[in-house]
Amino acid sequence: MAIASNVVEAGNAVRAEKGRKYFYFRKMIGDYIDTSIRIVATVFLADLLLRLYRCVVEYGSNGRYYLPEDRLWIILRRSCTYNNRSIYLIVGFLLVAFFRISVTGNYRNVMPTTLFLFQMPLYWIWSFTDMDQSTLSYSHWIRDSHGLDYAAGMASNYFHGYLKLSLPERKDDGLKHRLAMYEDKNNVTFGIKRLVILIPDEMFVNGVLESHLLDKAEPLETQFINRAGVYRPFKHDVYRMNKKVNGRTYYFAVEGATPMISFFDATYSNLSGTWQMQELKREIWIKFYKHLKELITTWPETRDLVELIIYNSHDSKGNLVDVGELLVAHMQNKTKTIDEISN
């Protein structure tokens, strides 16, 4: 009997010890969750106060950037707008906080104490010093789809101010019509029945394309289009391939992307160049191509009129890529894609 009693007592002791460990484990997890909620609540409150402070500074110092009748509303809306990820985070922690209150019955466990609130200046110091910002942050900002970056702006201006005006058919003056008229008049054939736009990674294209395979020919018929009260000429150069492909001589309407040339000039100019432009020029090059391609393919009037060719200006051996060979390769569907070039 004594032995049996000892066994029972030992079993009870083991169960009691396991119960204590389980209790302390649950308490540790609960305390961790409560502390996390307090930290998030403190950060949110500090961020809200910082946003309100910035509203006051913006209203007092930069009011000229807003119309008087809606200045306050726009400043508040811009300052107090949260992105989707922040909203999801706040809602998630609110749900966890309500769950903890329902379990413990004590809302004080998830409310920030005075000790937590006194830590808010640390968040303000962190924000004012922009400790989370780096050059990589600029890269991610350029890649986002907001239309405010340099690359998207150049692509949009190029598309709306040039391609969308000069290429679609209006009164028998569109690109397709002019290509057909050129072929009939000169008894030639275009290798690519679109306007070919070159986008090299150097962002520079000579005024006359240099290639031992290309000879400059007569340009397409010039268009004159009224733009802001001025009849502006729109021209497209034509080049003849002096090497026969499949027994035929082909012509190409081809030109460089002029916004990229302007960006090249701006980057290397002492007046406008910055180290950020130098550092992120490849990001801008790729974003320009992607955004321009999206605009061209989305707009019904231009999706079949432009052929973008993005390429590295030098091959793996450091030799300059020949534009004529590039056109032949593209015509034969061997041009590298943007993903291959990026890698």
Swiss-Prot record:
It is found in: Endoplasmic reticulum membrane. GO terms for molecular function: 2',3'-cyclic GMP-AMP binding; 3',2'-cyclic GMP-AMP binding; cyclic-di-GMP binding. It comes from the Eukaryota. InterPro entries: STING, STING_C, STING_C_sf, STING_LBD, STING_TM. The keyword rRNA processing does not apply. Glycans are attached at residues 84, 187, 270, 333. The chain crosses the membrane at residues 87-107, 109-129, 195-215. 3',2'-cGAMP binds at residues 157, 232, 235, 255, 258, 262. PANTHER family: STIMULATOR OF INTERFERON GENES PROTEIN. Belongs to the STING family. This is Stimulator of interferon genes protein homolog. It comes from Drosophila melanogaster (Fruit fly).
